[in-house]
Amino acid sequence: MSAYGIEYLDDAMRNLGEMTDYAVNACGMDLEDFWKLFLTTGYAEKFGEGVPRVVSGFSGTELAEEVLRKAGKKDELPEPQVEFTCSREYWSGWILAYYQWYSEKKFKEIEAGLPVREVVEMYPALHEAPEDKFVEAADRIIRRKEQGKNALRRIRKMAGYTQK
């Protein structure tokens, strides 16, 4: 069962999209660097748990500012953006919010199997597709990586090697 109801999903998706767009396109941060901050400051976990203040209480810009403040990035932040276009970064945050909600996986777990840089690369092919197409593609990528790790683990075990 998802951490929050479907009635909050659109807001959650918009906010995560706005958060990533603001961090990259207004603040000039590298998407991967900002995403790591999102994951390590605890906000990704709170978002995934459905904490109302994080999912829909903050705007996406406010959420980005909170992440940056908690990470110790207290530089002067640009003015909030009024309008957001569907940039690659916006779409990446937007679709990851959907995928996290749908799959019920933690953002850290998603990042381990499908890094945000790979999500951005999926933009040209999937940004106009229904969300379930992204879910299928993401599940396939994550499953393939997990199978590869398990196969390597089996080969090491059969050869008598251990990984420490």
What are these regions (language model features)?
Residues 105-111:
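Thiolate-centered catalytic microenvironments shared by cysteine-dependent enzyme domains
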Residues 40, 44, 66-77, 97-105:
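Amphipathic alpha-helical interaction surfaces
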Residues 121-163:
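Glycine-rich, aromatic-bearing surface loops/beta-hairpins
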Residues 9, 13-66:
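N-terminal interaction modules that seed assembly of large macromolecular complexes
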Residues 1-2, 72, 161:
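Intrinsically disordered, low-complexity and often Lys/Arg-enriched segments
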Residues 52-84, 88:
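Long, compositionally biased
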Residues 2-3, 7-10, 86-102, 114-125:
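A structured, charge-rich N-terminal accessory region that forms the first stable segment of a protein
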